[in-house]
Swiss-Prot record:
Keywords, in A-Z order: Amino-acid biosynthesis, ATP-binding, Cytoplasm, Glycosyltransferase, Histidine biosynthesis, Nucleotide-binding, Transferase
Annotated EC: 2.4.2.17
Subunit structure: Heteromultimer composed of HisG and HisZ subunits.
Taxonomic lineage from the root: Bacteria, Pseudomonadati, Pseudomonadota, Betaproteobacteria, Nitrosomonadales
Name of the featured protein: ATP phosphoribosyltransferase
Source species of the chain: Nitrosomonas eutropha (strain DSM 101675 / C91 / Nm57)
GO biological process, one term: L-histidine biosynthetic process
Entry note about domains: Lacks the C-terminal regulatory region which is replaced by HisZ.
Physiological role: Catalyzes the condensation of ATP and 5-phosphoribose 1-diphosphate to form N'-(5'-phosphoribosyl)-ATP (PR-ATP). Has a crucial role in the pathway because the rate of histidine biosynthesis seems to be controlled primarily by regulation of HisG enzymatic activity.
GO CC aspect terms: cytoplasm
Gene3D superfamilies per record: Periplasmic binding protein-like II
């Protein structure tokens, strides 16, 4: 069995992580976008990749099923983070967590008047902390997708979601009204593995750090 297991998710994060893997001398032997394999061998016999859902990456690392992983800050904020070390902001998969409402909705007045808003999001912990810090009382509705639909069918007054270009909001007649925080992907490491496998993991951390884009 390979000494090091790295948990990744398909899609943008995997694609953006390839330069970091290459910097560490790691070349995947299969393309997860076309292969059905969940365990991807690499050119290094001591390193393998496991492909999991983005929201599951921290769990695999926390419980030691993977030694390292790459996960978005949004995912990590919703996870309890026990047993995880977050040494690097890789500055990839960048976007913003925003509050958005339908066009024409006067969010500022609703906040000023102390209205109790219904907010749809899959980022319940983060949204709760954000609105509590503003002294706002909200009813949070947990959704897992198609967030933009919620204000259009009166399920919610607002949504909290990730926004990259804003194109999806515009296409659905929504507008971003408040930024909660910038989001990017982080390298995470199992704390026990960092101690027990340090001679192998430390060079990976150094290679990843050297590959972080400058001036981003």
């Amino acid at each position: 069995m390979p000494d090091i297991t790295i948990a990744l998710s398909k899609g943008r994060i995997f694609e953006d992580t390839i330069p970091f893997l290459e910097a560490a001398g790691i070349i995947p032997q299969d393309d997860p976008d076309t292969s059905r394999k969940l365990i991807i061998e690499t050119n290094r016999p001591d390193v393998r990749l496991v492909m999991v859902r983005a929201t599951d990456v921290p769990t695999y690392v926390q419980y030691g099923a993977a030694d390292l992983g790459v996960a978005g800050k949004d995912v990590l904020l919703e996870h309890d983070g026990v047993g995880l070390y977050q040494p690097l902001d890789l500055k990839i998969a960048r976007c913003h967590m925003m509050v958005a409402v339908r066009d024409g909705y006067d969010y500022a007045s609703a906040v000023f008047q102390g209205a109790r808003l219904r907010v749809a999001t899959k980022y319940v912990k983060t949204a709760r902390s954000h609105f509590a810090a503003k002294g706002m009382h909200v009813d949070l509705i947990k959704l897992y997708g198609s967030m933009e639909l919620a204000p259009l069918v009166d399920l919610a007054d607002a949504i909290v979601d990730l926004v990259s270009t804003g194109g999806t909001l515009k296409a659905n007649r929504l507008q971003a009204v408040e930024e909660i925080m910038p989001i990017s992907a982080r390298l995470i490491v199992n704390q026990a593995a960092l101690k027990l496998k340090n001679p192998t993991i430390q060079p990976l951390l150094e290679a990843f750090n050297a590959a972080i884009p400058a001036n981003v």
